[in-house]
Swiss-Prot record:
Name of protein: Nucleotide-binding protein Moth_0258
Positions annotated to bind ATP: G14, L15, S16, G17, A18, G19, K20, T21
Family membership noted in the UniProt record: Belongs to the RapZ-like family.
Keyword hit for GTP-binding: yes
Function description: Displays ATPase and GTPase activities.
PANTHER family: RNASE ADAPTER PROTEIN RAPZ (PTHR30448:SF0)
Gene source species: Moorella thermoacetica (strain ATCC 39073 / JCM 9320)
One Pfam assignment: RapZ-like_N
Highest classification ranks of the organism: Bacteria, Bacillati, Bacillota, Clostridia, Moorellales
Residues at which GTP binds: D68, I69, R70, G71
GTP-binding found in the keyword field: yes
Amino acid sequence: MPETKYPRLVIVTGLSGAGKTQAVRCLEDLGFFCVDNLPPSLIPGLVDLLGHPGKEGEGITKVALVMDIRGGEFFSGLDAALNYLDGLGIPYEILFLEAADEVLVRRYKETRRRHPLSSGGQILEGIIEERRRLEELRGRASKIIDTSELTPRQLKEQVSELFGSSQRRLIVSIISFGYKYGIPLDADLVMDVRFLPNPYYVPALRPFTGHDRCVEEFVMASPVTRQFIEQFAALLRFLIPHYLQEGKSHLVVAIGCTGGQHRSVTLANKLGELLQGENYSVTVKHRDVVRYLSTGNRR
């Protein structure tokens, strides 16, 4: 019989307005499977489902559940669910976020949102009542973060330190594209390589793509190309640690030529090769080259 191996379970809770949404976004970046406001009665079933190999959800090793006062009567069953997990010896961690009353009041006024427990628009009364209701749960917390003086970046750093691996890794996605089809919407950095020699104007090379050796050799034969790709890779090696320090988890680098068929494809591949082996994960995708592989499209 396969050994039961339960996922790492983190329950994120705390005062409304204290930063639970930002904390959960960080946990998602760290690879956690996140569920918002799951009824407590379903927690044991979810943990059991994920803890047995061969069932749905296999491969999920880290789970974060957001539980807060918005759950109403559901939230009152959380204590029973935790006691059930304790009885089975299933480990879990509780991350409790809080902030000073005056800070929470200010945040609610800035966002113009209504506190879930406020009556007649009295924000402070709602905060005090919520703090009272959560007092026992706070006492069970594994980790408590006071966000009163924290910026979103600082909160992300604390959550990453608590629940991330010992060494955070940035995902670098390199995408080739053609300007005639538009710049990728999710690009963080865009590099225009239309200044490089264009294989399109060599009739023998026109039918091929940047994946083909003949096009690659033509593009890389230019001293300007070789100097450019080395300097661009060096720039990224300089930038990436600073992006990581700022809390960024995914960097999209888009490299564009006219049609996304020749130059951008070759250079995206070359850049991926130069960045492999560094302390970050690198993927290379070619958005528009498929247009030229089967349809015979020409610019």
